[in-house]
């Protein structure tokens, strides 16, 4: 198989894959739920009113009560006590990385202070929001069949004031809330924020000073009306996965896009040692329960809202006793280094390089190399260039073998032409004679395909690394490239890519190519140039450097095998 056919296979595989991704976005946009402009969507704080029994979800499975292994609680309903005086005041908690607005039960709004919405803007990304059209919040509540539990507005801050800021030099911000129920039952909830951390610790202590046992379970949910993303290559957000993900030690990492949210009846599964999250481009929210806690994982829809929920085990607090439970709520970016510090199994998969484990592993490896290069070079653009150089060096033996195979095939082109002339239209005899020739001369006609098969998964894994890595978000390279995750504003890199592909095409020997293949080859640089024009600049930078190094390597290989580049260029010009 000559170099040209290998190139064509590689090119058309790329075109097919990119068209498939584009078709997927088109299908997603067509099937996505659309909230009409006149439709009334409850405000974000109204989302808290929907308890597990109010949402359209399956009944809770049996989860053993704490202290009574194997016991099965009755089907849970909510018996929430009304708020003492309407909705609780909204309290603002601010650390160095987060600004949260919450009422003790729900986080209503969350701003990521170190991530501006635009390159030149000052407003931070608002991940959780009270936007009436697309509310998105995180709730932690209590439910019980018979015992009183806090309802909406039930929790109140213990300390006076509505604003709590992490002071300079302070590494931890602790803000307690309390619900005082009837008959001496109370729940003390403590929010803990740490400097530089996006995981919020939430601990509940149930204090029973009544004369009767108290029964209940905690539920934690993420609820949002998904934003309808505009489809297209010019919108990088539409290429990233948007939906729910969860992890279990038994099944591993699983995910469900918003457009397919209720496929197979949603989710209703008991899991120990897992987590649940809602993902979008560069950012995510997640509930992470205690490692040894069994929870019922539920995906459901409540009107226009998609809900991902955990229901903890039911437990009983005897009179005069105290019981506690805690969890972490992640509200922040997909920063690999900070996610690793949480020490949660499988949580690294929220950086969604691929749903396939092998591709995810390749992506994680590429990012590991990329991040280490960045630690030396202090620029993500130069780190990408460094990664290309390392990949080219690692794949050089394969490239050399590929060219050697192609050169050997070209030397035997006259003999293959003689065989074709000898056997005419008898394709069977021609193929038999060809295979005998290959066997005798030790020619592997598929020798040029091995480097292609190895490079394809690396290329696509790198594509997702560059699309998914929030570390590259708004990261400049030099000059006109001020955001490696956005397209080249002046199309300089795509034009360079076209030029390099055209030069590579001219330097590629094409013996025996039929006219149809020749025409296809002429249009390939232009087709790729148009596609690359709207892709992230970091990816096009990779492709330009990779193509440029490939061109130099091909020039070197031609000379090494006794061929003259000028003759190949002249032959291709005919």
Curated annotation (Swiss-Prot):
GO terms for biological process: protein insertion into membrane; protein transport. Required for the insertion and/or proper folding and/or complex formation of integral membrane proteins into the membrane. Involved in integration of membrane proteins that insert both dependently and independently of the Sec translocase complex, as well as at least some lipoproteins. Aids folding of multispanning membrane proteins. One of its GO terms (cellular component) is plasma membrane. Keywords: Cell inner membrane, Cell membrane, Chaperone, Membrane, Protein transport, Transmembrane, Transmembrane helix, Transport. It comes from Xanthomonas axonopodis pv. citri (strain 306). Belongs to the OXA1/ALB3/YidC family. Type 1 subfamily. It is a multi-pass membrane protein. The keyword Chaperone applies. Its main location: membrane. The chain crosses the membrane at residues 6-26, 356-376, 380-400, 447-467, 489-509, 525-545. It holds the Pfam family 60KD_IMP. Interacts with the Sec translocase complex via SecD. Specifically interacts with transmembrane segments of nascent integral membrane proteins during membrane integration. CDD domains: 5TM_YidC_Alb3, EcYidC-like_peri. The keyword Transmembrane helix applies. GO terms for molecular function: membrane insertase activity. It is found in: Cell inner membrane. This is Membrane protein insertase YidC.
């Amino acid at each position: 198989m000559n170099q040209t056919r290998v190139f064509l296979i590689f090119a058309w595989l790329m075109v097919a894959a990119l068209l498939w991704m584009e078709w997927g976005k088109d299908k997603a946009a067509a099937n996505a739920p659309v909230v009409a402009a006149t439709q009334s969507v409850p405000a974000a704080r109204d989302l808290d009113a929907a308890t597990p029994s109010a949402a359209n979800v399956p009944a809770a499975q049996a989860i053993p009560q704490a202290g009574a292994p194997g016991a099965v609680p009755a089907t849970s309903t909510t018996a929430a006590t009304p708020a003492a005086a309407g909705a609780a005041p909204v309290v603002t908690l601010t650390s160095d990385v987060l600004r949260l607005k919450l009422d003790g039960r729900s986080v209503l709004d969350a701003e990521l202070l170190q991530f501006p919405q635009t390159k030149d803007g000052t407003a931070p990304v608002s991940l959780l929001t009270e936007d009436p059209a697309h509310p998105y919040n995180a709730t932690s509540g209590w439910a019980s069949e018979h015992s009183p539990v806090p309802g909406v507005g039930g929790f109140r801050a213990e300390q006076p004031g509505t604003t709590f800021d992490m002071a300079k030099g302070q590494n931890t911000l602790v803000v307690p809330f309390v619900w005082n129920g009837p008959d001496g039952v109370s729940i003390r909830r403590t929010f803990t924020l740490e400097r530089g951390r996006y995981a919020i610790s939430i601990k509940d202590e149930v204090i029973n000073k009544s004369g009767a046992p108290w029964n209940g379970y905690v539920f934690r949910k993420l609820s949002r009306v998904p934003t309808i993303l505009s489809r297209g290559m010019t919108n990088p957000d539409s290429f990233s996965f948007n939906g729910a993900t969860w992890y279990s030690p038994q099944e591993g990492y699983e995910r469900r896009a918003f457009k397919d949210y209720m496929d197979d009846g949603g989710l209703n599964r008991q899991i120990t040692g897992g987590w649940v999250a809602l993902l979008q481009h560069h950012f995510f929210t997640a509930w992470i329960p205690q490692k040894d806690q069994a929870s019922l994982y539920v995906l459901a829809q409540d009107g226009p809202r998609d809900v991902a929920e955990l229901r903890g085990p039911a437990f009983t607090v005897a009179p005069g006793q105290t019981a506690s439970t805690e969890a972490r709520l992640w509200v922040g970016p997909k920063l690999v280094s900070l996610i690793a510090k949480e020490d949660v199994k499988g949580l690294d998969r929220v950086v969604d390089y691929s749903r396939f484990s092998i591709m995810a592993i390749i992506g994680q490896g590429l990012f590991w190399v990329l991040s280490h290069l960045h630690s030396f070079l202090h620029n993500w653009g130069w780190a990408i260039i460094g990664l290309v150089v390392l990949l080219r060096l690692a794949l050089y033996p394969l490239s050399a073998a590929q060219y050697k195979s192609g050169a050997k095939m070209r030397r035997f082109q006259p003999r293959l032409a003689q065989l074709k002339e000898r056997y005419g239209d008898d394709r069977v005899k021609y193929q038999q004679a060809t295979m005998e020739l290959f066997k005798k001369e030790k020619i592997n006609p598929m020798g040029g395909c091995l480097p292609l098969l190895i490079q394809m998964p690396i290329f696509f894994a790198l594509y997702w690394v560059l699309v998914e890595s929030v570390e590259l978000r708004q990261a400049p390279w030099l000059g006109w490239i001020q955001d490696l995750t956005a397209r080249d504003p002046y199309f300089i890199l795509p034009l360079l890519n076209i030029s390099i592909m055209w030069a590579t095409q001219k330097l590629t020997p094409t013996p025996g190519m039929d006219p149809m293949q020749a025409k296809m080859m002429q249009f390939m640089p232009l087709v790729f140039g148009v596609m690359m024009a709207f892709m992230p600049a970091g990816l096009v930078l990779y492709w330009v450097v990779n193509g440029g190094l490939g061109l130099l390597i091909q020039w070197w290989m031609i000379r090494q095998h006794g061929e003259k580049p000028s003759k190949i260029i002249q032959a291709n010009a005919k």
